[in-house]
Amino acid sequence: SGGSGGSGGSGGSGGSGGSGGSGGSGGSGNNDGPGGNYSYTSGMDKELKQILFEIEKKENYEGALKKLEVYVYENPQNANGWNLIGFASRKLEQYDNSEIYYNTGLEIDPNHEGIISYQGELYLKTNRYEDALENLAVLDELCNFNCIEKKALAEAIKVYEEENSL
């Protein structure tokens, strides 16, 4: 499925993979939450799952960000860690940091569907619509039939288009 998908990899990075049918698309009403991509938590160690709980259940992005900074320092080859720190940074509107974190994760796993999707949402937040469309095209190539990451980005693009009369 495009090479990611819980494949292990160095440092236990795994990928977000073709999550086919795993739950909803996140909890915050705008299809933007790690729940949809991570409800199965494939490729995540116990520590990362605990941090994910901070994000999903408590929406404690600041607390999660502090823990994720330590986590990625100790696990620099874990693309899932970079994805979550990018997500938490984006939710805190730290867009420059978020972009750096997503790019770092993609250097580790260029086919990480979760990062590609979230990076596309970051592009929308920073008014880079064309870049978001490019990420959607990449997901089109990578994703299987029921790809939550692709659906989430497509929905975010649709909302962006409606809000900006595109």
Regions found by a protein language model. Give the residues of each.
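Terminal, low-structured helical/coil segments at or just beyond the last alpha-helical repeat
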Residues: 3, 41-42, 133-166
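Start-of-helix register in tetratricopeptide repeats
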Residues: 46, 80, 97, 114, ...
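Structural marker of alpha-solenoid helical repeat scaffolds
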Residues: 74, 108, 141-145
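Canonical tetratricopeptide repeat
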Residues: 84, 118, 152-156
